[in-house]
Amino acid sequence: MPRSGPILSGRYNTMEVIYRYDGSFEGFLCCVFDSYVNKEIPWEFQDESHLAQSLFPVRWIGTDLRHAQRILVSLEKIDPWAKELVVKGFLTCAANKELLLYRFIRALYRVGKPLLRQLSDDALLPLLKAVRHLDGEVHLLKGFVRFSEFEGMLAGEIRPKNRVLPLLRHHFCSRMYNETFLLYDRTHHEALLHEPGKWAILPLEEFKMAAPSAAEAQYRRLWKRFYDTIEIKERHNPKLRRTHMPQRYWDTMTEFQDESYFLAGTEALPDNPLPLEQAHTPSPLPPSSPAVSG
């Protein structure tokens, strides 16, 4: 016997109507809830930042946390993995991710738990691919994030395709629980802020790293020199390196920056700078070093 969703299902018609919501995960779940209440399948979902004109009427769906919770509870009852797929799916960079999620949820309510074993199903496969891409990017960034120290605070930047900060939060907050740090997502203009005992992910339109201190610039040079030194020159393989360390991450990684990145704020770049491996060895390290560098 087919399952029904959180609202008793009846006949549904695909409507030429667009659901617009506030862009939050809870707001999207309220769109799902309202589609069952109204017994209609929306043509498209748009967040409130969408300004393009449409030929179809637009219906604003307000966010009601009680409605969102009912959807989440219904997914959890079917299978915890179903809930995880929906939560992660909303963080992906998949085109029309709301439609992917909506089709999956409707199919899940209709078929039930057996859908989760049908990995090639049209309602499940696109979502699985998107979530795998998200998980892969999270895994890579756990090793590719580079922090710098600024007056006792650590700061780093990333440029991911997916919204990864909610999934990176536990990794960095648990390993750096005594540190105050900021990790900025350039793509989605949000930042993970942490200080001992508390954290938050907040919108941040712009963020620019300050010029490094002399000590921080020195640590950057040392990290770059370490990276260059450990390579076995006879086994140099640029193609393999790009496979394991995709080039789109390089612009936020210390070891791939140009010469100006390794100068303190009071230093000037010479007209003909020497490569780092030929540069003068930096002065001895200060007695206290930052917990995370590079």
Give, region by region, the residue ranges found by the protein language model:
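N-terminal amphipathic/basic-hydrophobic helices that include classical n-h-c signal peptides
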Residues: 1-13, 293
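Short, hydrophobic/amphipathic alpha-helical patches that form generic packing surfaces
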Residues: 27-38, 102-110, 170-174, 221-228
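Charged, alpha-helical interface segments at or near domain boundaries
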Residues: 46-140
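Acidic, Ser/Thr-rich peripheral helices and adjacent loops at domain boundaries
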Residues: 62-67, 198-211
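Short coil/turn segments at secondary-structure boundaries
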Residues: 85-89, 186-187, 235-242
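Internal, well-folded beta-alpha domain core
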Residues: 114-204
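Long, compositionally biased intrinsically disordered terminal regions
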Residues: 180, 191-192, 211-291
